[in-house]
Regions:
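Small/polar residue-rich beta-strand/coil "junction" motifs that cap repeat-based extracellular fibers
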Residues: 1-20, 28
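Active-site rim elements
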Residues: 10-14, 58-64
Length: 146
């Protein structure tokens, strides 16, 4: 059984369909990066004895390439959209770090797909109308040629 979050509608109020879709997704900057694990441990104030024990693992961990987002970039994108996004965990003090809750990106991704689908449907209609116009123009042209 996978991870689940409490989402029962019977215990929710003040529900609004105001999640930004494409506007939010288009502001995000997917990146690849190497995590500086030792630097993170130092920043978080991990004890030297623990860091010495973990020393052999640092080199391996720091070679791995990760894919994701920079939390501060996500925070900036949400701020620019006036979106109170709950997918960014902000530092609680000067020795805490930013983190992201990737599952909270799903509503914006769903909204973006819905918005794209509406655009696709509009373009299909426009394309069909243009095809009819071209067919009518071709028929008129053929009549003029005779």
């Amino acid at each position: 059984m996978g991870w689940s979050n409490f989402r029962d509608g019977r215990c929710k109020s003040n529900i609004h369909e105001d999640v930004p879709g494409l506007a939010c997704i288009n502001k995000l900057k997917p990146v690849t990066y190497k995590l500086e694990v030792k630097k993170l441990d130092q920043f978080l104030g991990r004890k030297d004895s623990l860091m010495n024990t973990m020393q052999p693992g640092y080199a391996i961990a720091e070679k791995k390439i990760h894919t994701g987002f920079v939390a501060q970039d996500v925070e900036k994108a949400a701020f620019e959209l006036h979106y109170d996004f709950d997918g960014v965990n902000h530092p609680q003090n000067d020795k805490d770090n930013y983190s992201l809750v990737y599952s909270q990106f799903v509503p914006s991704l769903v909204k973006a797909v819905q918005e794209q689908q509406l655009l696709i449907e509009e373009l299909k209609k426009e394309n069909e109308n243009l095809r009819h116009s071209v067919t009518a123009l071709q028929a008129s042209f053929e009549k003029l040629k005779k």
